[in-house]
Curated annotation (Swiss-Prot):
Annotated protein name in UniProt: Hydroxymethylglutaryl-CoA synthase, cytoplasmic
Localization per Swiss-Prot or TrEMBL: Cytoplasm
Gene this chain is encoded by: Hmgcs1
Subunit structure: Homodimer.
Family: Belongs to the thiolase-like superfamily. HMG-CoA synthase family.
């Protein structure tokens, strides 16, 4: 066919394109799910056991999607001593929409102003919880295309997941993850191994532009999630089997071939059920299952059809029990952030990746294949895989990315526990004020983590102004400008901590860098 390459043609791509660095941000306060059970008057264990959730992070009216993303981007740049001119693509995945026209990415460009770097491709990508993964794929595709100019891509996934009071509220959360994408990475995207499923469904959607709350069909949402997992896993297995056959290896792919398996996590119990679901797929796909000891006791389920089992309690119970050890080995560690902070929508699955990288040594991770299932309602889903580099030596890229996340658990533990009634008051405040113009947030900034960007005001034209709570690493904004090396030998740019010019502080606010998404 004209314009097509022959199937056996080989192209030349940059080597080992993947995740070079990762940063995660979550707010400084949470509500305890056991206390929330008491406050809501539900049975003990409904949230903690039934959903598998221990704590739920939330933000006050001082934080919005722009401030979350400003914070996580600047923290990634600072932690890795990166210059802002080394970014050639910046894309945001989010479903937290505060402006139907102006992108979150355009707000983030304020961090790049003093560097003079405005030649940055990318924009916002939205489809429920899948937008972050779509942005990641766009970044990888850019680096592997003729458009690539040799610089890094930066992907930001972030959301504020909140629900109206009721059964869905304990499945909320908030957070953002920034991923630096480039060649020679320690966590590499497996080329040609994506299993995708797209379908029209009204399982979860947000049609009311004046509300942050979604419309949710809980039962349909679970069915859509599990059916998408079935389809994506089937496509992935076919693609990797085809690759293996080209390499002379004739075998079926199973869960055992993943070193780790991570999922988009609306709540932890669904992830455990999903791992069991993949085990069910392996079982039904194994022509010799009667001879395989790992399926002992499951013989009665040999004739079930996947589409008939979404809510079959007997199947669910049997395969969760049979896959319990696999869950402990391959998935349980990935639920640290989800269990302690809740659902972060687009950044949820990348919080799971951060959890794995934070809890295993480079030596334990080296050479492992990580399965990743990303799901967004509506619906869009992909199962793909990452391959961890073999180089786990001190000072290696793998050593650096794990070291940068080693404080994850202590950061989660350093948050402040807030009483359920205070949490409910904050949710009501957001409900009443998130859409207002000419608004000054009411909550204090004193409880914010150092280095957190926060909302200062929304003016009469809905233009938002932000400031950053000073960090001990900032020293003084008046003590000259620190320098970090760019990726060229002759250039220097101001340190990321000094990117934004300081404006006079508003009444009652500490002096700090201030930026606005309106006129300066």
């Amino acid at each position: 066919m004209p314009g097509s390459l022959p199937l056996n043609a080989e192209a030349c791509w940059p080597k080992d394109v993947g995740i070079v660095a990762l940063e995660i941000y979550f707010p400084s306060q949470y509500v305890d799910q056991a206390e929330l059970e008491k406050y809501d008057g539900v049975d003990a264990g409904k949230y903690t056991i039934g959903l598998g959730q221990a704590r739920m992070g939330f933000c006050t009216d001082r934080e919005d999607i722009n401030s979350l993303c400003l914070t996580v981007v600047q923290k990634l740049m600072e932690r890795n001593s990166l210059s802002y001119d080394c970014i050639g693509r910046l894309e945001v995945g989010t479903e937290t929409i505060i402006d139907k026209s102006k992108s979150v990415k355009s707000n983030l460009m304020q961090l790049f102003e003093e560097s003079g770097n405005t030649d940055i491709e990318g924009i916002d990508t939205t489809n429920a919880c899948y937008g972050g993964t779509a942005a990641v794929f766009n970044a990888v595709n850019w680096i592997e295309s003729s458009s690539w100019d040799g610089r890094y891509a930066l992907v930001v996934a972030g959301d504020i997941a909140i629900y109206a009071s009721g059964n869905a509220r304990p499945t909320g959360g908030v957070g953002a993850v920034a991923l630096l994408i480039g060649p020679n990475a320690p966590v590499i995207f497996d080329r040609g191994l994506r299993g995708t499923h797209m379908q029209h469904a009204y399982d979860f959607y947000k049609p009311d532009m004046l509300s942050e709350y979604p419309v949710v069909d809980g039962k349909l949402s679970i069915q859509c999630y599990l059916s998408a997992l079935d389809r994506c896993y089937s496509v992935y297995r076919k693609k990797i089997r085809a690759q293996w056959q080209k390499e002379g290896k004739d075998k079926d792919f199973t869960l055992n071939d993943f070193g780790f398996m991570i999922f988009h996590s609306p709540y932890c119990k669904l992830v455990q059920k999903s791992l069991a679901r993949m085990f069910l797929n392996d079982f039904l796909n194994d022509q010799n299952r009667d001879k395989n000891s790992i399926y002992s006791g499951l013989e009665a389920f040999g004739d079930v059809k996947l589409e008939d089992t979404y809510f079959d309690r007997d199947v669910e119970k049997a395969f969760m029990k049979a896959s319990a050890e696999l869950f402990n080995q391959k998935t349980k560690a990935s639920l640290l952030v989800s269990n302690q902070n809740g659902n972060m929508y687009t950044s949820s699955v990348y919080g799971s990746l951060a959890s794995v990288l934070a809890q295993y040594s480079p030596q334990q991770l080296a050479g492992k294949r990580i399965g990743v299932f990303s799901y967004g309602s509506g619906l869009a889903a992909t199962l793909y895989s990452l391959k961890v580099t073999q180089d786990a030596t001190p000072g290696s890229a793998l050593d650096k990315i794990t070291a940068s996340l080693c404080d994850l658990k202590s950061r989660l533990d350093s948050r402040t526990c807030v009483a359920p009634d205070v949490f409910a008051e904050n949710m009501k405040l957001r409900e009443d004020t998130h859409h207002l113009a000419n608004y000054i947030p009411q909550c204090s900034i004193d409880s914010l983590f150092e280095g957190t960007w926060y909302l200062v005001r929304v003016d009469e034209k809905h233009r938002r102004t932000y400031a950053r709570r000073p960090s001990t690493n900032d020293h003084s904004l008046d003590e000259g400008v620190g320098l970090v090396h760019s990726n060229t030998a002759t250039e220097h740019i101001p340190s990321p901590a000094k990117k934004v010019p300081r404006l006079p502080a508003t009444s009652g606010e500490p002096e700090s860098a201030v930026i606005s998404n309106g006129e300066h």
